[in-house]
């Protein structure tokens, strides 16, 4: 059995796995902030405050219009991704992250497959996301699923002064892209 076959995913209903979710969200924001500071000299988030806000608003990542998908490898939660509603036809992927020690085992692909299945189940016609420009491996993964680059969209949560450091992508779910 190869590593990819050992990666499993599960959808989460809160409060299940809330501590793992908070830890991965925090780790993602710290890692992303450090890279943004190193590469661009900017620091877009206070990770602790951002996680606290996401936890307060966690219902947006829950059914019927959203979902959180965890990836698990050999019994350890190693990554996650979140889906939320922009409008009745468009969902947004947020906070997709795989712990660096678990990368290259298929966890990101498994999370994305799970999120897109959830988006189709909700009935979204499109899914959007934003991603820091330095996350080239993630962009390759998104493109392999059919995502295309788009302009910044008005519903993005990132302050506009940071949009130049981000890539915006969209997947049309009316086609079978995978």
Predicted regions, residues:
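Acetyl-CoA-dependent GNAT
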Residues: 4-7, 11-94, 99-100, 112-113, ...
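C-terminal "cap" of GNAT-fold acetyltransferases
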Residues: 4-7, 127, 132-136, 140-178
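Loop/helix-junction capping segments adjacent to catalytic residues or to phosphate/diphosphate-binding pockets
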Residues: 15-19, 105, 136
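Structural signature of beta-strand start/N-cap positions in the alpha/beta core
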Residues: 67, 125-126
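Active-site acidic-Proline motif in GNAT/NAT acetyltransferases
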Residues: 99-105, 133-134
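Short polybasic/polar patches that bind polyanions
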Residues: 103, 120, 143
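Conserved G/P- and acidic residue-centered "switch" motifs that form tight phosphate/ATP-binding loops
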Residues: 106, 123
């Amino acid at each position: 059995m190869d590593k990819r076959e050992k990666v499993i995913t599960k959808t989460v209903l809160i409060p299940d796995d809330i501590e793992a979710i908070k830890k991965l969200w925090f780790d993602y924001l710290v890692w992303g902030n450090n890279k943004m500071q190193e590469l661009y000299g900017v620091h877009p988030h206070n990770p602790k405050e951002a996680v606290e806000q996401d936890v307060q608003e966690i219902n947006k990542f829950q059914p019927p219009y959203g979902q959180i998908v965890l990836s698990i490898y050999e019994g350890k939660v190693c990554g996650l991704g979140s889906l939320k509603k922009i409008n009745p036809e468009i969902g947004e992927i947020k906070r997709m992250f795989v712990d660096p020690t678990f990368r290259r085992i298929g966890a990101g692909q498994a999370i994305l497959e799970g999120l897109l299945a959830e988006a189709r189940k909700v009935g979204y016609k499109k899914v959007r996301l934003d991603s820091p420009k330095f996350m080239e491996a993630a962009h390759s993964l998104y493109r392999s699923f059919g995502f295309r680059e788009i302009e910044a969209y008005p519903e993005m949560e990132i302050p506009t002064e940071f949009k130049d450091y981000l890539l915006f992508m969209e997947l049309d779910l009316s086609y079978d892209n995978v």
